[in-house]
């Protein structure tokens, strides 16, 4: 899980979602693409 100031989809499988007020990226193909916005 990467924590970044700005999250962007890295491939066509990445989905941008919102959980508990945080913007996150989840990826079915590559788990390395998981990201979360904020500190």
Swiss-Prot record:
One Gene Ontology term of the molecular function aspect: structural constituent of ribosome
Keyword Ribosomal protein part of the UniProt annotation: yes
Pfam families assigned: Ribosomal_L36
Family statement drawn from the similarity comment of this UniProt entry: Belongs to the bacterial ribosomal protein bL36 family.
One cellular component (GO) term of this entry: ribonucleoprotein complex
PROSITE patterns per UniProt: RIBOSOMAL_L36
Domain of life, per lineage: Bacteria
Name of the protein: Large ribosomal subunit protein bL36
UniProt key word Transmembrane: no
An individual GO BP term: translation
Record-linked NCBIfam families: rpmJ_bact
Keyword terms of this UniProt record: Ribonucleoprotein, Ribosomal protein
